[in-house]
Structures are given as structure tokens and as C-alpha cells.
Amino acid sequence: MPGGAEGAHRRLGAGRPAGPSAHAPDQDRVRPDGRAQPRTLCESAVNRPGTVPARLGAFSEPDLPDPDGLRSCVHCGICLPQCPTYQVLGEEMDSPRGRLYLMRAAAEGRLDITPTFTRHLDLCLGCRACETACPSGVPFGRLLEATRGQIERRGRGPARRALETLIFGLFPHPRRLGPALRLLALYQRSGLQSLVRALELLRPFPRLRAMEQLLVTVPRGGRLPALVPAVGARRGRVGLLTGCVQRLIYPQVNAETVRLLSRAGWDVVTPPGQGCCGALHLHGGRLDEFRALARALAQAFPEALDHLVVNAAGCGSAIREYGHWLGEAAPAAALARKTRDVTELLVEADLPLRPIEAVATYHDACHLVHGQGIRSAPRALLARIPGLRLVELPESDLCCGSAGVYNLLEPQMADRLLERKVDNIAATSATLLVAGNPGCLLQIAKGCRARGLAVEVLHPVEVLARALGS
């Protein structure tokens, strides 16, 4: 059997129909000889180090993709087997290397921002698994976000634009999302949800169906205290980001985060006026909105904090990018430098944990493991709980298909990835699935429900809180 990325390419592509790809016209413009080779790239501004022109081929200011970043790919293909969409489709242009070819071709003026170009970029999850694999340090996530910014400025088709207007007008705004969730709670409790699902009334509307299938029982959450003092020896003062989805759908995660941090010796400040961190906007290329939200968040938190604690992987990853997108001198960048995932602080504490007799497995949220490089801390915390047997999840860092709002925009691809994730969970015989991101929790819980798996899907702080007791 052939080995390496090239062998994986052949194996994954083996089941596809023969004949030209639907994307062949654009692929031929990027790869005239039908192969992915660097010699097909022409000489242009992208090949001149240090050049930052006002216009770069099909791209224009502001927020041009970095020419040095585009040039840094050496076309080795190590990223290909790590890319979820490439694993599913086996298409070069739906791999990191292929997408970089498209971006670079557009930057060199050999390719315009066409619907086909946009489609390949839209199918990317932005999981950054390619960055973890890349020996050259290609900043794929930043290049993707900048390119999506270019696409957004060009405008979308009416259907996509309407869906994005709904999503971005609702999810990042807790004051709007809260009333919407209360209506959804009525939908659930009235029996209407059971009727809609039994009759499959949403089958003709895949994106709406995907949104409805994610629904969990909407909890009744209370407001967190503005300050909870440390218990015992004081270690310092932290602020808690409550998030948008987290505070409304998983309020218990925030409440237990405060309790655990307090028991670990931290004063916990939770500003009631804090808003969205902008993660969804960054991933979607809405860069001006992202910057505005970042500035507002920085103003909401006092400067006299040792750390900003985040318990949602997507939020933490986006906040750590503030310096890049707003400049290192910006107040938001100072907040980013203080940002820590909750597991990074709790792993330093010596909490008295009681036994939990269960089998658990851990899913690496993409924006925790690839976006922030946090892999060992959550596992170390779970391993400390007496009686809890931690079983490694096969392909633990393969995206579950949530990816922010990807599962709403691209439900078919998201479901294919979710099916593979649930297969792996079932293989562990675990009764607890642990993940550090609310989007992953919703997505994986949906998959386990559909499969009929008796698996409880929890955040790491929920498991630790059970072991800590009252």
C-alpha cells in the first residue's frame, strides 16, 4: 500500500467517479499540467519578499492575505491527510495545499474570486489541523480569514446572504438570542418539536433542519455575581468571559467555572456588560465587525487582571488573535496576552476530587488543540479524578463538524464528519464524552442522540465540578 500524503491521496480518491472534476476549469488555471506543482506559479508581487501593495491580484486593501504567508507553503502535502474535507472528498482543491494554490493564484492575478473559488474556501472548516501538521509554519488560518474577508466584501448570493444575516444577527448577540431561546423552549415543551420531527417537516430545508436538530433542552440560567472571592490562599484575580452560546445554552459551565476557579484561589470578576468576542465574525471574514467587538470586549474588562479566563475554545482562539488583527499596541491585544483557557489554570491547582466511577473519552476541540496548542491540560485534569477511566478517542483531534456555524452553513459536510466522530466515540464504549467548546458539545450531543448512544456529553469543568462536590 502506498505511504505518505501521496499514498493517502490515492487511497482517499479511489472511490470517486472517473472523469473530470466539477471544478476542473479553475483547477486547470491553477495547475495547467493537472498536477499540484510549485513551478506552475508565476512571478508576481507575491514572490517579492516584503512587498505589501495596495492591491494584490484579485485582492484589494484592506486586509490583504499576507504575501509571505502565501509564499511559505513548500507543497509537501503533509497537511493533506490531516484535513477533514480532504479526507471526505479526496479533492486537491479541498485540501489546505489546494486552497493555498487558489489563494496564491488569485493574489498573482491568474484567478478571480469566482463562485468556484468561493465554494472551495467555504467548504474549509477553519479547524487549523493543517497548521499543527505543517513543518513550514504556514499561517493558514489567518490567510483563510483574510481571503474570506475579500469574499465578503465582494458580496454573496441572496440565499447565503439571508442565512448569514440571520446567524450573525442572532448568535453573537445574547440579548437577541435569549428571547429566541425562550421561544424555542416553548416549542420544545409544547410538544410541537416532537411533532415536527416525527413528520419530518423540515426535511426539504436542510439548513433549518440542521439548526433544529442541534437544539437541547434550554436551561433556565441565572446571572453570575460580578465578583466571587477566592477560597483559601489567594493566587490572584481573573476575569471570566461568559460567551454568547455558553451563557445561554450552557450556563452551568460558567457557574461551575467560577466555583472551581474560586476554590483554586482566584478572585473571579464577571463584568455584566461584556459582549461577544467576535469569533464567529473572524472565522466568517467579517473583519470590521470582529475588530469592533474586540475593542468593546477589551473595554468591558478591568485592566487589573492577572488573566482573562475562557472556557470556550473558539472564543479563546479568536481572542488570542487580537494582536494580529488590531495591532500589538491595542488594548485588545493586551487582553489577548492575558488570555488562558480554564484548564490551563485549573491544572495548576490542587483540588480535592472525589471518585467518579465511569469511562470517559476526550474530544480535542479544534480551536483548543490546533488554535491554541492546548492538548495535555484537559487530559491531565481528568486523569486526576479517582475511579475515572480515561480512554483515548481515535482521531480525537478530527473536527466534529461544528466549526463555529459551519454545521448550519454546510450541514451535509458537517454531518459526514459527525458520523465519523460518533463512530469513534462508540468504539471506546465510554459513558462520558468530554469536550471544551460549546459548539462541539451541541454537535456531538446531536450525533449521539441520533445514534442512540448512552453517552453523556460534558465540558471538562462539569466533570471536575462533580468530582469536587458541593
Where are these regions (language model features)?
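Signature of N-terminal electron-transfer/Fe-S-associated modules in redox systems
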Residues: 50, 71, 89-90, 105-114, ...
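Non-heme iron-sulfur electron-transfer modules
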Residues: 47-59, 86-116, 137-165, 453-463
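Iron-sulfur cluster-binding electron-transfer modules in prokaryotic oxidoreductases
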Residues: 31, 140-470
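Short, intrinsically disordered, charge-biased short linear motifs at domain edges
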Residues: 57-70, 110-121, 262-265, 385-390
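Conserved glycine-rich FAD pyrophosphate-binding loop
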Residues: 1-50, 54-55, 62-68, 92
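N-terminal glycine-rich anion-binding loops that anchor highly charged ligand groups
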Residues: 77-81, 91-96, 267-272
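Cysteine-centered iron-sulfur cluster-binding motifs in ferredoxin-type domains/subunits
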Residues: 66-86, 114, 118-138, 397
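Active-site-flanking structural segment that lines cofactor/substrate pockets
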Residues: 104-119, 221-231
